Amino acid sequence: MIKAVYPGSFDPVTNGHIDIIQRGAKIYDEVIVLVAENISKTPLFSLEERLDMLRHSLKDIPNVKIDHFSGLLVDYLKKIDVKIIIRGLRAVSDFEYEFQQALTNKKLYPECETVFLVSDLKYTFLSSSMVKEIAKFGGCIKGLVPDYVAEKLYEKFKVK
């Protein structure tokens, strides 16, 4: 059984994330969506809220599990004996950062490999930050995030 980990803050999960997860789930026997607990920026949603939105959004993909971690990704990978990291690339600008991350992870855990999946063209502009900004001002986020996530965003920003 080949497992892969797709790490991120998922603050919140977007349809772009879900596209990468669905595609990863077609390639690997199991995809573990891993929510970072100790991200450098303060998240809008708590860890429990992010996990809840992921559970709702990914419930129809049978070979996807959701977990969370605090600390180095490679330590988590070693703990569960997984050697594959999935990362999505929206644009060339993502590549430089992701390439550095992949090399660092490889240095810390030589057995691990990072697999890059290029975003679907319709999601290349999409980011969690952009979605939060639109929702904050009451803009339409239909098609950018699952409906459940949109509800949670509007609730958080008290938008009717």
Curated annotation (Swiss-Prot):
Question: Sorted alphabetically, which Pfam families does this protein's record hold?
Answer: CTP_transf_like (PF01467)
| Record pathway | Cofactor biosynthesis; coenzyme A biosynthesis; CoA from (R)-pantothenate: step 4/5
Decide whether keyword Cell membrane is in the record. no
Which transformation does this protein catalyse, written as a reaction? (R)-4'-phosphopantetheine + ATP + H(+) = 3'-dephospho-CoA + diphosphate
A cellular component term (GO) from this record? Answer: cytoplasm
Q: Where on this chain does substrate bind?
A: S9, K41, L73, R87
The alphabetical list of record keywords is: ATP-binding, Coenzyme A biosynthesis, Cytoplasm, Magnesium, Nucleotide-binding, Nucleotidyltransferase, Transferase
Q: Where does ATP bind?
A: S9, F10, H17, G88, L89, R90, E98, Y123, T124, F125, L126, S127, S128, S129
InterPro entries reported for this sequence: Cyt_trans-like, PPAT, Rossmann-like_a/b/a_fold
Q: Name one GO biological process term.
A: coenzyme A biosynthetic process
Q: What is its main location?
A: cytoplasm
The protein's location, in the record's own words, is: Cytoplasm
- The answer to whether keyword Cytoplasm applies is yes
User: Site feature Transition state stabilizer: at which residues?
Assistant: H17
Q: What GO molecular functions are on record for this protein? A: ATP binding; pantetheine-phosphate adenylyltransferase activity
Q: Which cofactor does it need?
A: Mg(2+)
EC number(s) on file? 2.7.7.3
Family, similarity comment? Belongs to the bacterial CoaD family.
Q: Which NCBIfam families match?
A: coaD_prev_kdtB, cyt_tran_rel
Instruction: Please describe what this protein does.
Output: Reversibly transfers an adenylyl group from ATP to 4'-phosphopantetheine, yielding dephospho-CoA (dPCoA) and pyrophosphate.
Q: How does it assemble?
A: Homohexamer.
Name it. Phosphopantetheine adenylyltransferase
The species this protein was found in = Dictyoglomus turgidum (strain DSM 6724 / Z-1310)
What is the taxonomic lineage of the source species?
A: Bacteria, Pseudomonadati, Dictyoglomota, Dictyoglomia, Dictyoglomales
